[in-house]
């Protein structure tokens, strides 16, 4: 059982330690804690007994343990605060013209990695929730073509493929017609289901030779099922993570899955501190926060760093970036949905 004073002491030690990265002694706490040095030392000893503090090898001071950081995140972290002193710089960073969604997400990731010194990941709306709004096939050469998908009237995904040997020009038109008739307006999740259930029967009806046609469907749609992910500051992992964690970030789809699994459907923000699960990120801290992508859904910003982060400062910064990012995205999608020649 942690008393109110002990919690204040733990919070103050974490605040000092995350700024100085030096063990904290009782004298450093006396100005802020209205108690004698002896009382503070007793409380620090009790916090150590509970596993929330640990001794430093090189001094008589104490440092927060992993359990101490976990306790702080659960009981003391304020998720609603804003880094007001940094609002101007964050707004200024977004004061430029962007030509696609990925550029806006990349700017947010770059900004957060510069502020935090950590690795940052930004995720678009979950692929399964995106909707196919346009489709076309562009013939590139005698044997190659390009499938062009538009998701949510804003994101373009392309997939180059070899035209099957037995395909005629009219077969490509059939393929295009089937996709437009059966899939337009449906979510990616619905399309994935239809490819498994409806499409095999439709292929039998429309194609004389069905060899490789279902494989072609799966090939051209494969890219659409992948996460739209941007990263910044991967090199920072070398400062605080092991080689396995660094190499894990060479697999962006697995990184995206790990981040999504750490944030429940009903959560807007979450902080995981060395949660001990079987994961390459198990010994690290992951701060995840959802942000609104107008007209489409929500994306996720995630900061990956060492356990001894200044969590409150990072949450404040993430909150500001989220708000400015949402404003920028609102302008971006409002422009996309407007008549181009009426915009001044």
Swiss-Prot record:
One of its GO terms (molecular function) is DNA binding. Belongs to the HrcA family. Pfam families: HrcA, HrcA_DNA-bdg. It comes from Streptococcus pneumoniae serotype 4 (strain ATCC BAA-334 / TIGR4). Disulfide bonds: none annotated. One of its GO terms (biological process) is negative regulation of DNA-templated transcription. Negative regulator of class I heat shock genes (grpE-dnaK-dnaJ and groELS operons). Prevents heat-shock induction of these operons. This is Heat-inducible transcription repressor HrcA. Keywords: Repressor, Stress response, Transcription, Transcription regulation. NCBIfam families: hrcA (TIGR00331). InterPro entries: GAF-like_dom_sf, HrcA, HrcA_C, WH-like_DNA-bd_sf, WH_DNA-bd_sf, WHTH_HrcA_DNA-bd, WHTH_transcript_rep_HrcA_IDD.
């Amino acid at each position: 059982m942690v008393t109110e004073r002990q919690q204040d002491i733990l919070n103050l030690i974490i605040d000092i330690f995350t700024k100085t990265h030096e063990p904290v002694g009782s004298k450093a706490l006396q100005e802020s804690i209205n108690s004698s040095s002896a009382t503070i030392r007793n409380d620090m000893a009790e916090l150590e007994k509970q596993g929330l503090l640990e001794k430093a090898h090189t001094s008589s001071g104490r440092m927060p343990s992993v359990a101490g950081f976990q306790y702080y995140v659960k009981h003391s972290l304020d998720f609603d605060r804003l880094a007001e002193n940094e609002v101007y710089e964050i707004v200024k960073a977004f004061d430029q013209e962007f030509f696609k969604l990925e550029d806006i997400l990349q700017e947010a990731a770059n900004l957060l990695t510069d502020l935090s010194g950590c690795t940052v990941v930004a995720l678009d709306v979950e692929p399964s929730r995106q909707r196919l709004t346009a489709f076309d096939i562009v013939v590139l050469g005698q044997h190659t073509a390009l499938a062009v998908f538009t998701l949510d009237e804003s994101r373009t995904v392309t997939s180059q493929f070899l035209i099957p040997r037995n395909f005629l020009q009219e077969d490509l038109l059939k393929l295009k017609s089937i996709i437009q008739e059966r899939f337009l307006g449906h979510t990616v999740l619905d399309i994935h289901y239809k490819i498994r259930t409806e499409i095999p029967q439709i292929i039998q009806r429309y194609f004389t030779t069905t060899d490789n046609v279902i494989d072609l469907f799966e090939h051209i749609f494969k890219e659409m099922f992948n996460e739209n992910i941007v990263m910044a500051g991967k090199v920072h992992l070398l400062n605080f993570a092991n080689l396995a964690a660094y190499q894990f970030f060479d697999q962006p789809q697995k990184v995206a899955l790990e981040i999504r699994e750490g944030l429940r459907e009903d959560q807007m923000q979450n902080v995981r501190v060395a949660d001990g699960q079987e994961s390459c990120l198990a010994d690290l801290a992951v701060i995840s926060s959802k942000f609104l992508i107008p007209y489409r859904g929500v994306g996720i910003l995630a900061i990956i760093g060492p356990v001894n982060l200044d969590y409150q400062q990072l949450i404040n910064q993430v909150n500001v970036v989220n708000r400015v990012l949402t404003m920028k995205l609102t302008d971006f999608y409002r422009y996309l949905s407007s008549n181009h020649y009426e915009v001044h």
